[in-house]
């Protein structure tokens, strides 16, 4: 069994207009299903129902992109200008072997045509994979800055809070570890312009936004990743922290 670990930072603020706790969430620019397909994280020998389910979980635009059979365009949709030539060559050869050589993509297009509905782009807590010899907290801080543009001096880490969640997809165990931070007063205003921080963020992020608990619940119902079991306890911790702080 393979284990993949990601580490993130739940960063909160008190919205001074509505007196609600909010946290920063980022939205991926592509669906998890699309990423899994492009990186060949599936079995070509799996039953058709499993493959169709993967296409079901893509957005309509992603399915249309796959139907072009243009792997360069699919790859660019995820990586943009990031130079990962060795990985690209490896994944292209697998795509070519799986779908182009047998029948010039006819089976792939047929499977996509059987897909129904539309997947959603994932909202999640800023997180990422640790580098070699990097501590969990250092990783969380680095990933948060890379994805939001907010640097370390603008928030306070609350070291008493650390929470993790895991899930297993039949082949790989995914473990997410989260730390908690509170934004400094200077950035608590509701009109804080996150778009300025976002403009030069990494390619995988499409949006960044403050979300309260009601919004977190709404988002969780519309996607496969349920954020409430992580963000709910974090908000409760913040409430107690603010109560005793004052």
UniProtKB/Swiss-Prot annotation:
<dbReference type="GO" id="GO:0006167">
    <property type="term" value="P:AMP biosynthetic process"/>
</dbReference>
<comment type="subunit">
    <text>Interacts with host RPL23A.</text>
</comment>
<dbReference type="Pfam" id="PF00293">
    <property type="entry name" value="NUDIX"/>
</dbReference>
<keyword id="KW-0945">Host-virus interaction</keyword>
<keyword id="KW-0511">Multifunctional enzyme</keyword>
<keyword id="KW-1262">Eukaryotic host gene expression shutoff by virus</keyword>
<dbReference type="GO" id="GO:0044168">
    <property type="term" value="C:host cell rough endoplasmic reticulum"/>
</dbReference>
<feature type="binding site">
    <location>
        <position position="169"/>
    </location>
    <ligand>
        <name>Mg(2+)</name>
    </ligand>
</feature>
<keyword id="KW-0694">RNA-binding</keyword>
<comment type="function">
    <text>Decapping enzyme required for the removal of the 5'-end m7GpppN cap tethered to viral and host mRNAs to allow their decay in cells. May therefore accelerate viral and cellular mRNA turnover to eliminate competing host mRNAs and allow stage-specific synthesis of viral proteins. Acceleration of the turnover of cellular transcripts may even promote the shutoff of host protein synthesis. In addition to the mRNA cap, g5R also efficiently hydrolyzes diphosphoinositol polyphosphates.</text>
</comment>
<keyword id="KW-1038">Host endoplasmic reticulum</keyword>
<dbReference type="GO" id="GO:0008486">
    <property type="term" value="F:diphosphoinositol-polyphosphate diphosphatase activity"/>
</dbReference>
<dbReference type="InterPro" id="IPR051325">
    <property type="entry name" value="Nudix_hydrolase_domain"/>
</dbReference>
<keyword id="KW-0244">Early protein</keyword>
<dbReference type="InterPro" id="IPR015797">
    <property type="entry name" value="NUDIX_hydrolase-like_dom_sf"/>
</dbReference>
<keyword id="KW-0464">Manganese</keyword>
<keyword id="KW-0479">Metal-binding</keyword>
<dbReference type="InterPro" id="IPR000086">
    <property type="entry name" value="NUDIX_hydrolase_dom"/>
</dbReference>
<dbReference type="InterPro" id="IPR020084">
    <property type="entry name" value="NUDIX_hydrolase_CS"/>
</dbReference>
<dbReference type="GO" id="GO:0003723">
    <property type="term" value="F:RNA binding"/>
</dbReference>
<dbReference type="GO" id="GO:0046872">
    <property type="term" value="F:metal ion binding"/>
</dbReference>
<dbReference type="GO" id="GO:0006754">
    <property type="term" value="P:ATP biosynthetic process"/>
</dbReference>
<feature type="binding site">
    <location>
        <position position="147"/>
    </location>
    <ligand>
        <name>Mg(2+)</name>
    </ligand>
</feature>
<comment type="similarity">
    <text>Belongs to the Nudix hydrolase family. DIPP subfamily.</text>
</comment>
<feature type="domain" description="Nudix hydrolase">
    <location>
        <begin position="93"/>
        <end position="239"/>
    </location>
</feature>
<keyword id="KW-1190">Host gene expression shutoff by virus</keyword>
<feature type="short sequence motif" description="Nudix box">
    <location>
        <begin position="128"/>
        <end position="149"/>
    </location>
</feature>
<dbReference type="GO" id="GO:0004081">
    <property type="term" value="F:bis(5'-nucleosyl)-tetraphosphatase (asymmetrical) activity"/>
</dbReference>
<keyword id="KW-0378">Hydrolase</keyword>
<keyword id="KW-0460">Magnesium</keyword>
<feature type="binding site">
    <location>
        <position position="134"/>
    </location>
    <ligand>
        <name>Mg(2+)</name>
    </ligand>
</feature>
<keyword id="KW-0426">Late protein</keyword>
<protein>
    <recommendedName>
        <fullName>mRNA-decapping protein g5R</fullName>
        <ecNumber>3.1.3.-</ecNumber>
        <ecNumber>3.6.1.52</ecNumber>
    </recommendedName>
</protein>
<dbReference type="GO" id="GO:0039657">
    <property type="term" value="P:symbiont-mediated suppression of host gene expression"/>
</dbReference>
<feature type="active site" description="Nucleophile">
    <location>
        <position position="143"/>
    </location>
</feature>
């Amino acid at each position: 069994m393979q284990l993949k670990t990601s580490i993130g930072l739940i960063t909160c603020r008190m919205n001074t207009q509505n007196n609600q706790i909010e946290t920063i969430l980022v939205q991926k620019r592509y669906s998890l299903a699309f990423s899994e397909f492009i990186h060949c994280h599936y079995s070509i020998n799996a039953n058709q129902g499993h493959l169709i389910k993967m296409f079901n979980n893509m957005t309509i635009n992603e399915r249309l992109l796959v139907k072009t059979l243009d792997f360069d365009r699919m790859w660019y949709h995820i990586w943009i200008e990031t130079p990962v030539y060795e990985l690209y060559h490896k994944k292209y050869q697998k795509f070519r072997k799986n779908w182009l050589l047998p029948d010039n993509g006819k089976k792939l297009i047929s499977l996509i045509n059987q897909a129904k509905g539309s997947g959603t782009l994932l909202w999640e807590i800023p997180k990422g994979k640790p580098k070699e010899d990097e501590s969990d907290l250092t990783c969380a801080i680095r990933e948060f800055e890379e994805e939001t543009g907010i640097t370390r001096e603008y928030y306070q880490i609350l070291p008493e809070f650390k929470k993790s969640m895991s899930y297993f997809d039949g082949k790989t165990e995914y473990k997410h570890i989260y730390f908690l931070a509170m934004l400094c007063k200077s950035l608590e205003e509701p009109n804080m312009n996150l778009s300025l921080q976002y403009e030069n963020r990494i390619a995988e992020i499409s949006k960044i936004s403050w979300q309260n608990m009601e919004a977190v619940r709404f988002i969780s119902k519309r996607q496969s990743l349920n954020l409430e079991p992580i963000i709910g306890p974090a908000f409760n911790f913040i409430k107690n922290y603010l109560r005793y702080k004052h």
